[in-house]
Swiss-Prot record:
Entry EC number(s): 3.1.26.3
UniProt xrefs under NCBIfam families: RNaseIII
Record CDD domains: DSRM_RNAse_III_family, RIBOc
Family: Belongs to the ribonuclease III family.
This protein's name: Ribonuclease 3
Cofactor(s) needed for function: Mg(2+)
Active site, UniProt feature: D55, E127
One term of GO molecular function: rRNA binding
Any single Pfam family the record assigns to this protein: Ribonucleas_3_3
Catalytic activity of the protein: Endonucleolytic cleavage to 5'-phosphomonoester
Taxonomic superkingdom: Bacteria
Length: 236
């Protein structure tokens, strides 16, 4: 369809209402929220700025939700749960459940290459939609949308193991545009039947080390320590 005809934007407004439960008042904002950079480069503004905002709004609302749902959890455990809930794969999972790719406006080239099902596109677009709902309707409107989709995931966290610390640290690093963490075995001690491995992990120039009875366990322990360190430094 012609992306920005009067009829098409009304149809788009209805589609977004059906998947989000929110009806946009600002149609220009909605257009921007569903415009992929590939078509924006040709004629229009894209969702990238809204994506930036939506990422922060999602983190805020999920943090608030976890603070309320788990009053006995420590700061460290709440941080782990937040990372598990806002990591890219979870955002993509929700975007897929909403069929969000079907309403995105993108170039023919992007469409032909599978853009509507591309995980990166879906993650970015959902964060942009969150940012747009926040701008158009305020915190209460976007809180309602986020809780509708993230609260069931949060309540299931108690019944499932939290994300492996190495994976969580890697996604944290990538989310901050850092190189992926590197691990180095710096010592092996102990008896032959009971070795102790010491592994150092490096992220953005910062290093910590930890030990374990297996190299794998030492890496996980080091990742956990690093994750606690960097989230305290960089998260509000």
């Amino acid at each position: 369809m012609e992306p920005y005809s009067e009829d098409s934007i009304l149809a788009l407004t209805e589609k977004v209402f059906k998947i989000s439960g929110y009806r946009f008042q600002d149609h220009e904002l909605l257009k921007t929220a569903v415009t992929h950079p590939s078509i924006a480069a040709e004629r229009y503004a894209s969702y990238e700025r809204l994506e930036f905002l939506g990422d922060a709004v999602l983190g805020l609302v999920v943090s608030e939700m976890l603070y309320t749902l788990f009053p006995d959890d420590s700061e460290g455990l709440l941080t782990k749960k937040r990372i598990a809930l806002v990591r890219g794969s979870k955002v993509v999972e929700i975007a897929q459940s909403l069929n969000l790719g079907n309403i995105l406006l993108m170039s023919k080239g992007e469409l032909t290459s599978g853009g509507i099902s591309n995980n990166s596109n879906l993650e970015n677009a959902l964060e942009a939609l969150i940012g747009a709902i926040y701008v158009d309707g305020g915190l209460e409107s976007v809180r309602h949308f986020i809780l509708q989709h993230w609260k069931p995931l949060a309540t299931n966290l108690a019944d499932t193991p939290l994300q492996d610390a190495k994976t969580a640290l890697q996604e944290w690093a990538q989310g901050h545009n850092f190189a992926i963490p590197s691990y180095r075995l710096i010592n092996k001690s102990g008896l032959e039947h009971a070795p102790v491995f010491t592994v150092e992990v490096t992220v953005n120039g910062q290093r910590v080390h930890a030990t374990g009875c297996k190299k794998k366990y030492a890496e996980i322990a080091a990742a956990k320590l690093m994750l606690e360190k960097v989230t305290k430094q960089n998260d509000p």
